[in-house]
C-alpha cells in the first residue's frame, strides 16, 4: 500500500507541476504570436498546433508504454514537453513564428502526458481508491489554472529585463514545470 501511495503521490505531483507549466505557456502564447507575427490571423495557430502535439504525444506515449512501461512513457513525454518550452523560449529570442509553431507542437506532447497522468493515478490505485485517485488528479490540475498565470505576472518584469520580452517567463515556467513533472514520475514511481 505504501508503494502505491508513493506512486500516486508522484503522479499527482506530475499533474500539478505540468499543469502549472502548460497553463503558464498558453497564457502567453497568443501574445507571443502577436509579438513575432505581423498577421493577426495567425494568433490562434500556435495553440491549435499544440492540440495536434497532444495528439502526437499520445501516440508516442502509447508506443513507448507498450515497449517499456506507462511510467517511463510519462516521464519521457514530459521531458519532450520541456524541450518544446526551450524551442518556444528561443522563438522569442530570435523573433521566429515558425519556431513558435514548432515549439507549441512539441509542448503539446507534454500536455498529453499531463492528461495521461490523471488516468495513470487511477490505474495505480487499488480498486477501492480508483475514483479518489482520479478526483485528486483533476484537483491537482487546478494548481495550473491558479499558479501558472500568477507566476507569469509575478516574474514577467524580471525576465523582461533579462531577455527583453516579458512573455519568455511563461516558457521558462513551462520548462521547469515539465522537468519537475518528469522528475516526480521518475523519483516517486520507481520501486
Regions found by a protein language model. Name each.
Residues 1-53:
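Helix-loop boundary and gating motifs at the non-cytosolic
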Residues 16, 97-114:
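Hydrophobic core of transmembrane alpha-helices in multi-pass small-molecule transporters
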Residues 29-31, 111-126:
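Intracellular juxtamembrane helix-capping segments at the cytosolic ends
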Residues 53, 132-152:
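Glycine-rich segments within core transmembrane alpha-helices of 12-TM secondary carriers
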Residues 57-70, 156:
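Helix-to-loop junctions at the C-terminal end of transmembrane segments
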Residues 79-94:
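C-terminal ends and interior cores of transmembrane alpha-helices
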Residues 148, 152-153, 157, 175-191:
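C-terminal membrane-cytosol helix-exit motif in multi-pass small-molecule transporters
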Amino acid at each position: 500500500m505504501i508503494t502505491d501511495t508513493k506512486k500516486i503521490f508522484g503522479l499527482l505531483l506530475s499533474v500539478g507541476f505540468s499543469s502549472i507549466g502548460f497553463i503558464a505557456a498558453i497564457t502567453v502564447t497568443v501574445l507571443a504570436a502577436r509579438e513575432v507575427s505581423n498577421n493577426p490571423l495567425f494568433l490562434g495557430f500556435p495553440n491549435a498546433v499544440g492540440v495536434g502535439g497532444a495528439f502526437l504525444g499520445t501516440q508516442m506515449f502509447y508506443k513507448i508504454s507498450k515497449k517499456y512501461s506507462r511510467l517511463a512513457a510519462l516521464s519521457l513525454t514530459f521531458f519532450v514537453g520541456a524541450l518544446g518550452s526551450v524551442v518556444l523560449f528561443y522563438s522569442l529570442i530570435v523573433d521566429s513564428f515558425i519556431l513558435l509553431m514548432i515549439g507549441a507542437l512539441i509542448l503539446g506532447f507534454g500536455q498529453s502526458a499531463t492528461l495521461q497522468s490523471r488516468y495513470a493515478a487511477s490505474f495505480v490505485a487499488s480498486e477501492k481508491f480508483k475514483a479518489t485517485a482520479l478526483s485528486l488528479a483533476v484537483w491537482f490540475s487546478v494548481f495550473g489554472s491558479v499558479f501558472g498565470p500568477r507566476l507569469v505576472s509575478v516574474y514577467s518584469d524580471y525576465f523582461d529585463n533579462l531577455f527583453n520580452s516579458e512573455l519568455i517567463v511563461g516558457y521558462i515556467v513551462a520548462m521547469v514545470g515539465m522537468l519537475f513533472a518528469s522528475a516526480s514520475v521518475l523519483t516517486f514511481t520507481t520501486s
